[in-house]
Amino acid sequence: NRQTDGNLAAVYQMLRAQGESAAHILTRDLAGTTVSAFDANIEYSSILGEAPDLGVAFQTDPVGTQLERVAKIIASRQEFGVNRQIFLVGAYGYDTHSAQPTSLPNLHSRLDAGVSAFSESMKNMGIFNRVTLATASDFGRTLADNGDGTDHGWGGHQFVVGGAVNGGSLYGDIPPPSFEHGQDA
């Protein structure tokens, strides 16, 4: 809105002045760094505003929105002047100690839709063989049900998607398909 834009413009001008004239070196440095961040954000937004159509509709949930932004950056890679990039996208809500039977299918559906749209956008750009998407997590889940969900465990399932992925294999040791064994959490 105009009020916010006006306030940001005033803050920007104040920081620019502080970066040039503040008495303390740390004040000048902080102001200069913040002005550089403002400038980079303006350029970033301008480039993304001109990004080509991805040819696929992404969902508007957090995963879909983030993956769409990554796809637009990749589509605009020449304008950004970079050949190799690593992006981190966050997907939250998987700590399902309770209500797992109703929440987990929705989470999986969102992840599936986001990864599918992202993969299709890479195919539409003709670069599916040059882009790899991988999942990672800091914890896994137990196989045993706690009555309404699962608790923290030793590992979890991860996957890798991309045209260059040589799929069809499982990596790591598969625990016995039973409870109360030495590898059970």
Model-derived segments and spans:
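Feature for exported/extracytoplasmic and membrane-associated proteins, marking the mature portion
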Residues: 1-112, 117-124, 160, 169-185
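Metal-dependent active-site segment of extracytoplasmic phospho-/sulfohydrolases and closely related
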Residues: 122-147
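Histidine-centered active-site microenvironments of extracellular/periplasmic hydrolases
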Residues: 139-169
